[in-house]
């Protein structure tokens, strides 16, 4: 049934993972306040800061695989949402989606670690909303799986009573 509570959580997974593609995941400013490095789902970009060079792109590296994984996770959540008649399949799809989101989170952390070592190893960058959207999506996925499992156990217990 579409009106179940896990539907809301699966929809929130899709929204959170799609927001990752539009939001900044990580950023860091060097100690001289002359450059800023930003990680999005599509690029790792170094910008110039200061007078006259504000916003000029100094270097850009494509990390499109984070964006692709985020879109795949959102699509899988929406597909899982449509599989409400087959709870076992829905739990399996959510398990696969958790794996994809975990890989996305791992790649994002790895990219931030690598960028931090190159850009400014003495200071840590700041994780932005895009990073926390991945974490929120994982939590929403776990909660939705819990409610799906609860429904499955309820159906099995009713079958036992018959």
Language model regions located:
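Juxtamembrane helix-break-helix junctions at the cytosolic face
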Residues: 78-91
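Interfacial loop at the N-terminal end of multi-pass membrane proteins
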Residues: 14-68
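Alpha-helical transmembrane segments of multi-pass integral membrane proteins
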Residues: 103-162
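N-terminal membrane topogenic signal
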Residues: 1-9
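Hydrophobic H-region at the start of alpha-helical membrane spans
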Residues: 8-12, 69-71, 95, 99, ...
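Membrane-helix boundary/juxtamembrane motif in polytopic membrane proteins
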Residues: 88-99, 158-161
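Hydrophobic alpha-helical transmembrane segments
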Residues: 63-80
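Hydrophobic alpha-helical membrane-insertion segments
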Residues: 11-25, 96-105
């Amino acid at each position: 049934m579409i009106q179940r509570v896990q539907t809301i959580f699966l929809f929130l997974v899709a929204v959170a993972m799609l927001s990752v593609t539009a939001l900044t995941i990580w950023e860091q400013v060097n100690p001289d306040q002359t450059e800023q490095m930003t990680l999005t789902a599509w690029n790792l970009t170094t910008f110039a800061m200061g007078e006259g060079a504000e916003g000029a792109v100094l270097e850009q590296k494509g990390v499109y695989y984070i964006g692709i994984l985020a879109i795949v996770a959102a699509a899988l959540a929406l597909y899982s949402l449509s599989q409400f008649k087959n709870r076992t399949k829905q739990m399996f799809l959510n398990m696969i989606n958790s794996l994809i989101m975990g890989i996305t989170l791992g790649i994002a952390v790895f990219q931030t670690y690598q960028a931090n070592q190159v850009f400014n190893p003495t200071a840590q960058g700041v994780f932005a909303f895009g990073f926390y959207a991945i974490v929120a999506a994982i939590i929403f996925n776990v909660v939705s799986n819990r409610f799906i499992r609860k429904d499955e156990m309820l159906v099995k217990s009713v079958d036992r009573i018959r």
